[in-house]
């Protein structure tokens, strides 16, 4: 039973968002690191994300039954009742907001609330079944944890926040379009109008290339505007341009699944590397 409750929180999504929080928090903390603030920022944000993921699962039960990738999810198999899941999601969400507001700051709590509303209501409830641009709107919520990592320290919105926000929008679009190509048949079964379903795989591959290009440019601005060192720029550019190169090859490749899978996994490596590098950039 506990395993089922953990599963509906989508732990892998939570871990991915924690990576974003850690990177921006450690960057913004230098030269003083507050371990308690660090702990409560991660805990509060993780609980809010977990809550939003459960509500996402609840809203998508009918869709998930149609897709091979999701047909064995806990709520689809009724291992937990929708009522129990709703109560659990509401409880951990409220606790998460409370932790952020009381132990971090009101701004970070407010940002987490915005992310929650975008993901649950605008993306999952309103747009996912209606618009091929739902992924773009959903990426707004996925960029907010990185911003929260910074506002937990600064308690203000600045240019660095804006750059992080757009950097991770570009990253997410590249990442999720690769996923959409991998599972395009599932999305067709569920009648979801995701970009590759509506516009085709080739056009999606080209858009991935454009988004990665924008990601590289936006990441470089962190150096050109004085936030990060040129060592970061040099080292990270090597890996991000290789990601762009893979994307270019995928446009010409007929084996869509092979290169989309490669793009997907490499995008994970890129985001881990990015956050690792910004967290240690003070060394340089």
Swiss-Prot record:
Q: Which organism is it from?
A: Buchnera aphidicola subsp. Schizaphis graminum (strain Sg)
Residues crossing the lipid bilayer are 13-33, 35-55, 87-107, 108-128, 133-153, 162-182, 224-244, 264-284
Membrane topology type: Multi-pass membrane protein
Spell out the PROSITE patterns in the cross-references: UBIA
Report the family membership.
Answer: Belongs to the UbiA prenyltransferase family. Protoheme IX farnesyltransferase subfamily.
Functionally, this protein is described as follows: Converts heme B (protoheme IX) to heme O by substitution of the vinyl group on carbon 2 of heme B porphyrin ring with a hydroxyethyl farnesyl side group.
| The name this protein goes by in its record | Protoheme IX farnesyltransferase
Q: Which NCBIfam families match?
A: cyoE_ctaB (TIGR01473), PRK04375.1-1 (NF003348)
* Source taxon at top rank: Bacteria
Q: Name one GO cellular component term.
A: plasma membrane
Q: Which Pfam families does the entry link to? A: UbiA (PF01040)
Recorded hits in HAMAP family, A to Z, give: CyoE_CtaB (MF_00154)
Reaction catalysed by this chain? heme b + (2E,6E)-farnesyl diphosphate + H2O = Fe(II)-heme o + diphosphate
Q: What is the lineage of its organism?
A: Bacteria, Pseudomonadati, Pseudomonadota, Gammaproteobacteria, Enterobacterales
Q: What else is known?
A: Carbon 2 of the heme B porphyrin ring is defined according to the Fischer nomenclature.
Q: Which GO terms describe its molecular function?
A: protoheme IX farnesyltransferase activity
EC assignment = 2.5.1.141
Which Gene Ontology terms describe the biological processes this protein takes part in?
heme O biosynthetic process
Alphabetically list the UniProt keywords. Cell membrane, Heme biosynthesis, Membrane, Transferase, Transmembrane, Transmembrane helix
